[in-house]
Amino acid sequence: MSKSSTPTSARDSSTPLLVGACIAWGVATLLFFLLFTAPGEDGAQPDWFLTGINLLEIGAFFFAALLCFRNWRSSQIVSGRNVWFWIGLGLLFYAMGTVLFFIWGTVWGLDPAVSLGDFFYIFSYIFLAAGMFKAVLPRRLNLELPQWMMVVGIGLGGVLLAIFVNIAAAEAIAVPLGQVPAMHHLAQAPPDVAPAPALEAAPAEAPALEVEEEASSAPPLILQIDGMLEPLVDAVGLLYLIGDIVLLVIAGTLLVAFWGGRYSQSWKLIAIAAFCLYIADMFFAYAINTDTYVEGSLWEVFWTFSAIFFGLGAVVEHAVSVNSRRSPRRRRG
């Protein structure tokens, strides 16, 4: 028996444990969303629920980043160590962005148009795209026409879906706005009632002032930074859209380039992770554009699923790479 059999068997035994941990994390997240959701009368979720889903998402991205950095430190990874360094860095930045959004929204009660967390998200898209592109680049793609058409179709589908989300959001906003004049006239129909709302309007402003005071519990420096970043809201939204489409195109290319072969399974999982991220971002974009976003919606589970699939892809890639490098020496005595 070779002296290397002990560490090799340890690696083999860690693979099912890590795969099981990733799957269990995803199942636990889905069950938490389904079983413990408790929206109030206004549709908002309680703070303990928001804390729970944020911790599950942050933990999933940190865990997936560690698995990617594990591949980066291994000299046996077939797809290249730098590939997993950039993917791991992207996942780490995404986790840090979620931490900042949790602090801004749940701890400080802020809801700025642009915050520091947005920039961590944008950099995470850049790093993820760089890592996935490095995985495709060395393969010298010799795709046939149907395969290229599939990649182009995925890209066009992503662009059209993003356009549809924006158009649907604009129409959803236009419908209630069109109804406002009719409701306004109905309210003014009885002339005797007109002075009454005016008298009651003064005390109604008091709760609004209280809400503003409660929302300003963040440090003054943070409020100043949010005010400075607010003019960048359109540019940040455009960067998010470009990042989603680029990741979607690269994910489609990964599916085509790694469709068959021994090392295809890990990259199929990475592509699924990118698709999950895109799905969640499209739901988020629609909710933000229609001003109907409520943190803790069920579709947010796709963000955690994205981290889970990135982690699964890293585990499978490590297992396949280690087994392929040691297979010629397996029977050495």
What are these language model-derived features?
Residues S2-G333:
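Polytopic alpha-helical membrane-helix bundles and their juxtamembrane interface segments
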